[in-house]
Amino acid sequence: LFSEKLGPLLFDNFDINPEAYKLNIKDAFIVKYDENKQRSLEYHTDDSDMSIIVTLSDNNDYSGGGTQFKNGLTIKANAGDTIMFSSKYKHQGLEIYSGIRMVLVFFINVIK
């Protein structure tokens, strides 16, 4: 998934020269937002150069939720949609009110 799809998207969308830089997956994990457990995640930055969020749940699987950036931009992506951004941008996982929202998260470092 990463080397065939996500890596090339990072190179293209952020104008990173693949001949001069390498992408290193610092961490990858699944986050489960559940109305009975972790409902949200407060504003934070990630400890890497780039962050990728791949939505695993369909919008019909939960109510509420989404990713919101400090500037007010809110994205409620559907299953298979991907959000890529600088890890230095403050963002949060908005509260879900029912159901389960799952996302696959990658923390990426750009190495010269």
Regions found by a protein language model. Name each.
Residues 1-82, 88-112:
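Fe(II)/2-oxoglutarate oxygenase catalytic core
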